[in-house]
Amino acid sequence: MSSLGASFVQIKFDDLQFFENCGGGSFGSVYRAKWISQDKEVAVKKLLKIEKEAEILSVLSHRNIIQFYGVILEPPNYGIVTEYASLGSLYDYINSNRSEEMDMDHIMTWATDVAKGMHYLHMEAPVKVIHRDLKSRNVVIAADGVLKICDFGASRFHNHTTHMSLVGTFPWMAPEVIQSLPVSETCDTYSYGVVLWEMLTREVPFKGLEGLQVAWLVVEKNERLTIPSSCPRSFAELLHQCWEADAKKRPSFKQIISILESMSNDTSLPDKCNSFLHNKAEWRCEIEATLERLKKLERDLSFKEQELKERERRLKMWEQKLTEQSNTPLLPSFEIGAWTEDDVYCWVQQLVRKGDSSAEMSVYASLFKENNITGKRLLLLEEEDLKDMGIVSKGHIIHFKSAIEKLTHDYINLFHFPPLIKDSGGEPEENEEKIVNLELVFGFHLKPGTGPQDCKWKMYMEMDGDEIAITYIKDVTFNTNLPDAEILKMTKPPFVMEKWIVGIAKSQTVECTVTYESDVRTPKSTKHVHSIQWSRTKPQDEVKAVQLAIQTLFTNSDGNPGSRSDSSADCQWLDTLRMRQIASNTSLQRSQSNPILGSPFFSHFDGQDSYAAAVRRPQVPIKYQQITPVNQSRSSSPTQYGLTKNFSSLHLNSRDSGFSSGNTDTSSERGRYSDRSRNKYGRGSISLNSSPRGRYSGKSQHSTPSRGRYPGKFYRVSQSALNPHQSPDFKRSPRDLHQPNTIPGMPLHPETDSRASEEDSKVSEGGWTKVEYRKKPHRPSPAKTNKERARGDHRGWRNF
């Protein structure tokens, strides 16, 4: 700031008396003020800091350049003090009623003032200055009517840089300035042409359009302001020269001053110019028509922008979908049971490549191949198997287990519902054609208006015929063959043009093309040329009948595709796979269940012939731990789980705590269960912990009867439903109280085995659990009331 204070006249902030706001320049607001010590009316532009504008103004001195007085350098008050133009800006003058007084001499004088001021900046100033923001708002009118150029906030010294940033206001900006390209002094020539157009037409350039819309029109569409047809030729030629797209073809301000002088010597020009200025109503419609056309282009641009955004959104979704798919290993085939060792090797290679950034898992693919892991064995691998193969990292094991579980889940889900892919080795296909009748109705909606020039119309296509016919139409295309209209393609009804078309040209026609789906053998498409004619009555529609020959395909087996249910997959392996999946799905729920139910739930499935038989047998809700004992005992039959849960909280010495529902079992049901119970001893069951190395177990798992202990009571519940080799039921005598509890998994004492054999004889057939109790030797108290006895009649009540 000290350097600035030394080079500029410094004006104290207290030496200024501020009045109203006169407007805003670039980078600051302008106020009318009084310089008290000099008794002079001035304009003060308040700034956040002093930059290039003060440096530029300090070296300029010209009649048509605003005069610079000094700067304010008192933080936080910074500003530039210049002369005050009492008549305001040229923009305000042009858009006020005062502009109606303008004539040829007025315009020529002011056009010359601006041209001389810009010529001084470019050629006569101590340093060449490119204004870059010349517009009617930055040209002010002094008290004597002389135009002065102000607001150099966007200006630059020419020898500093020619690559400019985006500044200024778009309607006045040259195309190269809008694009932030290197500029020369002729960019001010373009802006001068816009200011001259304002003085001639007294209109706002590109009125109603936003800045970015103007930028797109000027740069991309090469649009320019409309020069009315009745404008004097000399002015029109000068404007065209100033607005050349090639900056080198634009005239310099020295040439412009010369052109203005020659125009002043033309004696016929004043009459033409004054006639043009006074007949504004005749040519104003030309400017409005141009603005309407440009707005239509802008609307079309907005519509295309929305389409591009929607397309971009769909592409992002598709990209995300492809990314997700790329993270999933590609399967050699959907028949995982038929995978060879090489197929598994390929799958593991993809898996470790996706989930391994440090290349630590790259050796695992070879481990799978060395251990002869096929598709069947892959889906049955357990944690111990992976450790035996040499995979010791817990994280890597979890990664493999998760991938194998997902592969198993997808395979079982797709087993009966395979992907809809054509099998090259399948049954031969036979072709058959069917005929679908379709009537295409072509017409157009018409708003007559006053004639063919201002009427509005749009084409449509309707259908009639078989209801299924619409499904064979792929798309409908309307081509109006108009230069400013695009070809419209629609893929779903209603098939009608979206926008109205204004005016009907001579011999106007619309080409309508209906394209059919690939299964339509003939015709592939239908083309219709519809004539558009103006009429005050409703135009007649044209009907075109079409017969579609539809190609249908079906197999020799009555059109029923092959089923995966008769696949060559190993049924025993598939059943084991299903059981493993069920066990893994319910492991979390079993880990949260009541600790009294210590027996494995899925050991009950051992020895079943099929998955359906295993599911049919228990009929137990998965979330059995959430059912209360009382409700369950009233609503379900006394299966093993119901009894185990109910009697875990009941006193077994209650008089009426027996099973009244046990008598409801029919003899046929008991016989069926008895046969099934007897037959299953001879069957080999598939152990759930079978490994992929061929460990299909034919033995059943033996388990020790569990004992639950509650305060003051002991009971023993049969595990026959859980283990076929265990006695279905037994009772506990009082002398058992003195025997030690057994440890699960340890063999019983011989005396205990003999007792268990005696208890087997007391078991009823059918797999029902039978619980007996012994009453205490003492007789009931005579003080017990009938009301208390009645309370024991309800089965399942607790006695506390």
Curated annotation (Swiss-Prot):
Q: Which domain of life is it from?
A: Eukaryota
**Leucine-zipper: region residues:** 287-308
Cross-referenced InterPro entries, in alphabetical order?
Kinase-like_dom_sf, Prot_kinase_dom, SAM, SAM/pointed_sf, Ser-Thr/Tyr_kinase_cat_dom, Ser/Thr_kinase_AS, Ser/Thr_Kinases-Pseudokinases
Write down which residues bear the modification named Phosphothreonine. Answer: 161, 586, 628, 664, 742
The annotated region (C-terminal domain (CTD)) lies at 774-800
Instruction: List, alphabetically, the PROSITE patterns matched.
Output: PROTEIN_KINASE_DOM (PS50011), PROTEIN_KINASE_ST (PS00108), SAM_DOMAIN (PS50105)
Ranges for domain SAM: 339-410
Modification(s) after translation: Activated by phosphorylation by PKN1, followed by autophosphorylation on Thr-161 and Ser-165. Autophosphorylation in response to ribotoxic stress promotes dissociation from colliding ribosomes and activation.
Residue ranges with Basic and acidic residues bias: 667-678, 728-738, 750-763, 785-800
Q: Which GO terms describe its biological process?
A: cell death; cell differentiation; cellular response to gamma radiation; cellular response to UV-B; chromosome segregation; cytoskeleton organization; DNA damage checkpoint signaling; embryonic digit morphogenesis
Effect of changing residue 162 to A: reported as: Slight loss of autophosphorylation activity
The chain residues annotated with the modification N-acetylserine are 2
Listed result of changing residue 368 to C:
In SFMMP; produces protein aggregation
Name-wise, this protein is Mitogen-activated protein kinase kinase kinase 20
